[in-house]
């Protein structure tokens, strides 16, 4: 499928910068008005997942959209709420789910979530489909939620329910090692520290809850994902180390196997992404994957001003899903 380099994403001139696009929505976007209903489901390994349900506006055929958030995010982040609002207006019931430990309460197990964990996404999707016998479903993911989504669709296409008609993923670090290297640069220290502050707090909490089982020596001195993932994320989730984790959890090797219409949107000025996160060759070889590369948009930014109070990402996702599903 084509690589769409001439995107119609045109942010306001004053926001024509990847860093500004990334930070502006976090600081200044009003929280979209949504009132989801929360549901808790059990996982097969004795843990739980918290789901937020948003009901479609108006009457029509029952259709389900599942939204996956980004690293250390949650289902009520502004970008999730904005997407949920856009899709419910188009007649989709929306299920926005929280990764383990991201719903406001620690999960029960020592393990948490990771960037390539597709089992929980599959569990959420199958639960959602069964709740109302939805005939049609679509997937939307942001950042590592997008990586999970793409990996899920491609690693075992036979496992994906037939009801899944299309998918959209934004700002995806589909090569996790490349993204980790980019974020380790001095220019991105602000973002790295933002995430590590949250991850360190979770490591300390897990250590207290599980009787001091973790080695926290040097935790505060860790300044990169590589160091944190090598000590915590990788061993807690069955990987040999950070390098093994990044290799096995990345969606990049699975993109050509995707069998449903899928739109991957990565802005060229995204400060989180390496060149390897723009998989033009995989898109060209795929019959289903479209890669769109707006000149600007930052990381999960895509700010746009319009009378509907929607961001460009929300309009683009709604239009693609309507056409593909």
Regions found by a protein language model. Give the residues of each.
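Alpha/beta-hydrolase-fold enzymes
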Residues: 2, 130-134, 138-236
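N-terminal cap/lid segment of alpha/beta-hydrolase-fold proteins
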Residues: 18-58, 303-305
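Short beta-strand element of the alpha/beta-hydrolase
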Residues: 62-70
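The serine-hydrolase catalytic nucleophile loop
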Residues: 73-85, 275-276
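Conserved alpha/beta-hydrolase
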Residues: 76, 84-108
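Catalytic nucleophile-loop/oxyanion-hole region of alpha/beta-hydrolase
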Residues: 86, 102-138
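Short beta-strand/loop motif that positions the catalytic acidic residue
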Residues: 258, 264-266
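Catalytic histidine-centered segment of alpha/beta-hydrolase-like enzymes
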Residues: 297-311
